[in-house]
Amino acid sequence: QIIKNTHKIQEKNGIEKSEVKEGGFSIPMTFPLEISEKSLKHGMNFSIEMETGTGKTYVYLRTIHELHQHYGWSKFIIVVPSVAIREGVLKNSAITREHFANLYNKPEMDYYVWDSKKTGQAREFATNDTLQIMVITIDSFAKAQNVMNKQSDYGRPLDFIKATHPVVILDEPQNMETDIRRNAIAGLNP
C-alpha cells in the first residue's frame, strides 16, 4: 500500500515514479526507502531532506497531525541533536500551534520537552490517549546512565515509551549516526 500511495503522490506532483526492486523500492531524490526484513526490524524509515529554512519543522509537525487525524496514531517523539535545535522546534511549535488547531479541529494534545527531573512524563506519554508529542535530545537517552534508562519505583521511563511503539522523527539525523545513537533510537521501539 505504501508503494501505491507513494506513486499516487508522485504522479499528482509530477515526480518520476519510484522503481520497485527486489527487497525494496527506490524513491528519487529526497525519499530513500528500503524495504527488507532487516529494514523493517525497527519499523519503516523515511528520509525527507530539505534545505535549511524551507519549512522542515512545519512539514513534520503537519505530518504528525495528518497521521493522527487519518490513522489515529497518537505517540510521537521528535529527537533532536542539541538544546539549540530543541529550542527552535519549540519556538516553531508555538508559532504554528493555532494554525494546526484550526486545520485539525483543535485536537486534544500534550506537547512537551522531556525533563529528566519529571520521570512521570514517560508514563503519562504512554497512558494518555490524546495526541502526545515529546521533544527530546538524543543525549538525554543515548547512554545507560541517563535517567531515561534508570529503574525507578514505577519502572524505567524508557520502558513506558517503548511499549507505545512511537513514531520517531529525527531532526538533523546526520548528527545521530554513531552506533550508540542509532542503538538508542532503535531502543525507543519505533
Where are these predicted regions, by residue range?
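RecA-like P-loop NTPase motor core of helicase/translocase proteins
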Residues: Q1-P190
